[in-house]
Amino acid sequence: MVSARLRKTDLVVDLKALGANVQRQREQLAPGSRILAVVKANAYGNGMVPVASALARAGVEGFCVALLDEAIELRDSGIQELVLVLGITPVEYAPLAAAQGISLTVGSLEWLKNYQRLAKEEGIKQPLKVHLALDTGMGRIGFTTPEDFKEALQLVAAPCFEFEGIFTHFATADEEDATYFERQRARFDDFMAVVTKRPPFVHVANSATGLWHQKSIVANTIRMGISMYGANPSGVGIKESFPLEPVTSLVTHATYVKQLKAGESVSYGATYTAKEDEWVATLPVGYADGYPRRMQGFYVLVDGQRCEVLGRVCMDQMMVRLPKEYPVGTEAVLMGRSLDQEITVTDVAEYAHTINYEILTGMGARLHRRYLG
């Protein structure tokens, strides 16, 4: 995929803000607690390797990714800290992880037994680092009974494993009603009752838990995800317990400016028709870049002023109404600040009837990433 350096459009990533968010989260944690920075999905669209490198300098203790391929890319880029693959990796690829000191998530007895057999057959000497996943109510992956978990604890004592962690994931930590959260927390306690010796990393807190439930959790590690990138995990549902600085901005420049006459229409389906003469700018950003097609009627910022998105967003371009004639090359902010005005990723998500996670992770590969700090 081409990173388009020759169009004046940047996804701007503020690494100082990223570090500030990590520091603010750390201030909320008990002394000695550790942070695993979640950099899966290209660091939520921000660029995995540059973001991880900045976070390593900021002192995070490790990283979480979704795929073994992502973990290998981090190792290849020089990242030496713990790297945990949160998804399930096929057993046949586990030797690659063992060779590079990459930690894998395990959620079944069958997987552990299959790897034991594979390690013996292939003569693998390097122990595989594993984190045992517990399904306390997310219903996704993990051991579902304390009995199976207890057997897993016995299996990971084998020489082919290095038992590094235990974790679960809360399904409703970003909601005001804590009933289901408390049910999951109690279920986690049931699992932990069979543990005779805790591994180095016990992590149950995601971004939402870190913002609103951290003091009720007995664990030594937090997985910091979307809050690290300056976005509220609940969207607009619950106010953050500490301030977050937005990390990601999307900035472009007008490629075409014209006067639209009354009665003339704009974009596919002719869904917008001018009621009077007005100035219109074409911007070189579209839904192929991750800006949602359904944003007609929303706005961008030009010179600190809200400028309405006219018609449907196209694959590569979009049109906005200007308050007056502006020259080609005028800056337009789709996410971020312009003078005293701001559009957050959550603002975009709310208008698009989705979540801020989807907007960030959907930022396209052809957007040129520009890093500050």
Curated annotation (Swiss-Prot):
Q: In which pathway does it act?
A: Amino-acid biosynthesis; D-alanine biosynthesis; D-alanine from L-alanine: step 1/1
Q: What is the protein named?
A: Alanine racemase
Active-site residues annotated for this sequence:
K40, Y268
Function description: Catalyzes the interconversion of L-alanine and D-alanine. May also act on other amino acids.
Query: What reaction(s) does this enzyme catalyze?
Result: L-alanine = D-alanine
In short, the EC number is 5.1.1.1
Transmembrane portions of the chain: none
Per the UniProt entry, what species is this protein from, by scientific name? Limosilactobacillus fermentum (strain NBRC 3956 / LMG 18251)
Domain of life where this protein originates: Bacteria
Q: Name one GO biological process term.
A: peptidoglycan biosynthetic process
Alphabetized CDD domains for the sequence: PLPDE_III_AR
**Keyword field:** Isomerase, Pyridoxal phosphate
Cellular component GO terms, alphabetically?
cytosol
